[in-house]
């Protein structure tokens, strides 16, 4: 049988979650009769329906987040396998820059290292 520490940390955790779950039924000031000094502060600019993600509106504003939307496949592409590019990644280099850079394979020496 596991020993429960008598330091009070388990009681403090229980009280925290009990206050957190009971905060929806507290008075308009944010406090409660059971815990008069514990007021849950609510910013006037934040929606009350989603208090757990206040940081999303802080960083991203009120716009919708396109990267969090559901991605749907089109019917004509659902039967195909995903397309994989066989070309090397250029990392934003222009074709002119790619022509100037020599391709060095393993086992070859770099002409720039010789000078």
UniProtKB/Swiss-Prot annotation:
Q: Which InterPro entries match?
A: PPDPF
Signal peptide location in the record?
Answer: none
> What's the short name of a Pfam family annotated to this entry?
PPDFL
Give residue spans, biased composition: Low complexity: 22-32
UniProt keyword terms in alphabetical order: Developmental protein, Differentiation, Phosphoprotein
Q: Where is this region: Disordered?
A: 21-46, 73-115
GO BP annotation list: cell differentiation; liver development; TOR signaling; TORC1 signaling
Is Nucleotide-binding included in the keywords of this UniProt record? no
Where are the Phosphoserine residues found in this chain?
9
Q: Name the domain of life.
A: Eukaryota
Keyword flag Phosphoprotein: yes
Positions with biased composition (Polar residues): 106-115
- Annotated function: Probable regulator of exocrine pancreas development.
Query: What protein family is recorded?
Result: Belongs to the PPDPF family.
Q: What is this protein called?
A: Pancreatic progenitor cell differentiation and proliferation factor
């Amino acid at each position: 049988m596991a020993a429960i520490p008598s330091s009070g940390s388990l009681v403090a955790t229980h009280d925290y979650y009990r206050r957190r779950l009971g905060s929806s039924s507290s008075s308009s000031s944010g406090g409660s009769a059971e815990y008069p000094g514990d007021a849950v502060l609510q910013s006037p600019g934040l929606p009350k329906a989603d208090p757990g993600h206040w940081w999303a509106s802080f960083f991203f504003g009120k716009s919708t987040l396109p990267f969090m939307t559901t991605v749907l496949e089109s019917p004509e592409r659902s039967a195909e396998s995903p397309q994989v590019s066989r070309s090397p990644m250029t990392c934003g280099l222009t074709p002119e820059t790619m022509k100037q850079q020599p391709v060095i394979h393993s086992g070859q020496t770099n002409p720039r290292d010789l000078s």
